Amino acid sequence: MVSPGLDLELSFSQALQGFGFSPEVARLLWLPLPMLLVLVAAVVGVLVSVWLERKISAAVQQRIGPEYAGALGVLQPLADGLKLLVKEDIIPARADSLLFTLGPVLVVVPVIISWLIIPFGQNLLISNVGVGIFLWISFSSIQPIGLLMSGYASNNKYSLLGGLRAAAQSISYEIPLALAVLAIVMMTNSLSTVDIVGQQTGAGILSWNIWRQPVGFLIFWICALAECERLPFDLPEAEEELVAGYQTEYAGMKFALFYLAGYINLVLSAVLVSVLYLGGWGFPIPVEWLAGWLNQPIDAPLVQVITGTVGIVMTVLKAYLLVFVAILLRWTTPRVRIDQLLDLGWKFLLPLSLVNLLVTAALKLAFPVAFGG
């Protein structure tokens, strides 16, 4: 049995009503909070990821890395952000200023909005719309438009080539990514991220989808790295060929938005892998045992707080383990050529994801208990 955990909206409403606010006013005050929580979670995730990348990269190269900005350099990402914030915002003379400004916004906004459907507990998510996976795929398809727009509007050959590469890469890897997720949806009979995690809670770690979908897991992770433009798939901004790709003409906060979107997307992809394949917030011990040890009913506030906290910690730990793997891959794999990138997507991952989907359908019919019949 899974504890219902914390209900953010209900808890917030009850707290305000305790101070004398009416339910209508409490509801009105709740409305702006989800996006604020999403922004805070995304920014904190980026700051932690940037610091980890700097320190892990330094360790791989036998360097110390940042150490002066705060203890162990933990304030270095914040210092970098402040530096970009005060830099001059330059628009090239022959650039399309409207599209040049709109491009970075179209890149970062869909990634931030995608956090709305990420669950950290049974009720510990911003928006349980029931079709969270569909929404995430829809939002992710907007990003290539912003990348191509940025490259085109810069009026620079390197920027345009980088934008075209980014769009081609994103389109090539979105299809096998969606097919890998479709196999999970088929087993769960739901597009809800909450239902997908709930389906993995029956037998602890043995219930995780990674054991039933090992091929789908690998397809999803490879495609996620390509969508995030991480090595070995960072062709849109290959320094030796394209200066900085679609980012070449950008400076200041517009450049920072690309930087921000890349790391938010990396953390988002890692959290989604945790949710889809690694049991999400899955509690390491039965909730009934915890409630009995605390001598509390299973729906007691204390039990809910503990299970909610542990659920968040479990989800974040699994996600940052994958971020650690992505950072190591940056320094241990060479960049692929553009023809190799497209061949991998269209000639290998796409057929493999189709076969994986068909095999999952067959196993669902043959073994309905194990594969969600």
Swiss-Prot record:
Localization: Cellular thylakoid membrane
GO molecular function: NADH dehydrogenase activity; oxidoreductase activity, acting on NAD(P)H, quinone or similar compound as acceptor; quinone binding
Keywords on record: Membrane, NAD, NADP, Plastoquinone, Quinone, Thylakoid, Translocase, Transmembrane, Transmembrane helix
Membrane topology (UniProt): Multi-pass membrane protein
Any Pfam family the entry gives: NADHdh
UniProt EC number: 7.1.1.-
Protein known as: NAD(P)H-quinone oxidoreductase subunit 1
Lineage: Bacteria, Bacillati, Cyanobacteriota, Cyanophyceae, Synechococcales
